Amino acid sequence: MEVVRYFTRNQKQLPATGPNDSIVQLPDIPPCYECNVEVALRFDSSLDSEKLQQSLKQLLEIGNWRQLGGRVRRRDTNPSACNYDLHVPAEFTTERPAFNYQIWELSGAIDEHPTASKMPRPTDPKKVSFYNVGDARSPLRTRTRYPRKAQEWADSDLPPLSFEQLSFRDGTIILLVFPHILMDATGYGLFLKAWTSVLQGRIDHVPQCCGFSESTTDMLGHKTPAGAFTWHNHLLKGLDSLKFTAGLLWENRWGKEDRVIRVPAKFIMHTRDKVLADLSTSQPSPFVSQSDVLIAWFTRVVLAALKPLQRRTLVLTNAFDTRHMLPPERAYLQNSVCMAHTMLPVGEVLYNPVSFLANEIRRSLVRERTEEQIQARCAWAKDVGIMPLLGTSDMLLCNVSNWSKGNLVDLDLCHAAVTEHRGPCVPSSILNCSQMGGVTPNYGIILGKDSQDCWWMQWHLPKFCWAGIERELDTINQIRWE
């Protein structure tokens, strides 16, 4: 009911703070984090909603995990500031619960439902699969009207963790919703892992949770000066920033759409073997990961379909986790990612083989994941802004976020299965339903690897380029690469 009350009351009336609420100051965040993260998971088993809710309640009474039930509040009345707090109730009650959980009972089969049936499912593991998911995303994310931005959460008294369960005769869809100011994908993955530990009766496996008031970047220290940051002289500002914004507006004029691509394990292994063979002619012990190859291969496919001027600069940003720098005994849920930048002329990327871009992506990650570079980046960002824009005024910006470390594909809810379940009960489909809003650059999400080691990706690109991408994928499927 709190969801309904939020959208029917006077928006200018701010919610009262509970007299015994504990106030937790969230680290400052850039404006791009003020959106929601909304993810739909399909399970091919009926799940017991009571077991799922009881295990959630149990988790959110353990130590700092309770902070996930806090209410978002704006710390600064300045509307341009991105400073928020969590007001954590001393006790979670029916009126102020630790989380919101909506249940929709549907009597039919999951594949008979007009929306659920359109979520991407594994098909031929030997072919690159292509899914148009526009019709599947909208109905899932609009069934309940949650706040969409951090300020809307601050105007409500809703708990930031929200779940919607669509229960069918033979399956379940769970929509996970949370404000991005709280966590990144890896942090949410740590939360889900703790949840399943409680669900399985293994409370002793739940790690200590780091409080949200502790900034992971501050934990790393600031011993390295800002000038040591690799890209410190590539800040986009002034007229160059205006030119880039105008160009981005122009490129968004036709609108953008999402597609999901499933890439066979053997294709990536074959491509990686070829990349390593190419690199071995100039390097003694070359290394690139499967995700390096995946991003490099598909970025070249995207560039070929977009047909940008070859003199433009491709700026490929690749999100990486900084938790490897922190003590391992605690779970760090808060946003803890930085962006590795690869800047190359478009023509150079298209002229050279996949190995060229894959190697540059790996070099960027190796260079920017060091403790010194992360410290320098944080010091530099404090000088020029929390998340400054790097690149050139004519750049083609492409952002990539790798959710594979969040392990969404491994979320095992077998202990909540209504009927006896042999083996794990993991998602058969994952769909990002988040709404970025406004003008956005091109971006892709690596959703993870499934049980057949096939990679799943979801990309947000201009509508006009998808036909060319689909033709290229069809061509690839005609080639014998096993």
Swiss-Prot record:
Instruction: Tell me the superkingdom of the source.
Output: Eukaryota
| GO BP, sorted A to Z | terpenoid biosynthetic process
User: Gene3D superfamilies this protein is in?
Assistant: Chloramphenicol acetyltransferase-like domain
Q: Which top-level enzyme class is recorded in the Swiss-Prot or TrEMBL entry?
A: transferase
The pathway entry for this protein reads as: Secondary metabolite biosynthesis; terpenoid biosynthesis
Q: Which residues cross the membrane?
A: none
Coiled coil: which residue ranges? Answer: none
Summarizing the function annotation, the protein's role is: O-acyltransferase; part of the gene cluster B that mediates the biosynthesis of the fungal meroterpenoid acetoxydehydroaustin. The first step of the pathway is the synthesis of 3,5-dimethylorsellinic acid by the polyketide synthase ausA. 3,5-dimethylorsellinic acid is then prenylated by the polyprenyl transferase ausN. Further epoxidation by the FAD-dependent monooxygenase ausM and cyclization by the probable terpene cyclase ausL lead to the formation of protoaustinoid A.
UniProt cross-references to PANTHER family, sorted A to Z: FAMILY REGULATORY PROTEIN, PUTATIVE (AFU_ORTHOLOGUE AFUA_3G14730)-RELATED (PTHR31896:SF69)
Q: How does it assemble?
A: Monomer.
Its name, as the record gives it, is O-acyltransferase ausP
Q: Which organism is it from?
A: Penicillium brasilianum
Q: What is the lineage of its organism?
A: Eukaryota, Fungi, Dikarya, Ascomycota, Pezizomycotina
Gene that produces this protein? ausP
